[in-house]
Amino acid sequence: WKTAKYIAKTEQVDLLVVELSALLHDIADSKFHDGDESIGPQKARAFLHTLEIEDNVINHVIRIIENISFKGGKEAQTFQSTELDVVQDADRLDALGAIGIARTFNYGGFKNREIYNPTIPSDLNMTKEEYKKSTAPSINHFYEKLLLLQELMNTATGKAMAAKRHQFMESYLEQFYSEWEGTL
């Protein structure tokens, strides 16, 4: 939410749409609901109706929620808006850098995944369904998603922030492999 507001300062956006989307986009996240992508938008819509938000704002927020996530594969994004660009950049930035690394290993632990297994290569050609069902080690996630995000950023501010976080993750991986091999 804070990152979305920060990026929004440099863009011409409806700040209410940005803030609501940033706050609600992970409500009932599909990865915690057996991949069901309809629960989050339904819950967000129901909540927004309790606030007496205008229908056009609700519809815009829901479209953002439906289109924000990285889903793997080569699926093209069909809905576009500057508000989506801002919130999507903020969401992607959450996956990068120090916090992104912490989240990666936290989720990997939740899913009982290995931290690293050098015999399991990263798969950069997964379909959306394969990505959602992947049980690969957490380190693979860096190559299958995290290190790809910098090139997917939408806004100039998001790109600049992503570059710093991307570099940090590359340094982290270099350190990780040195420690894994016992050379550092």
Enumerate the language-model features and the residues they cover.
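Amphipathic alpha-helical interaction segments
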Residues: 11, 30-34, 51, 55, ...
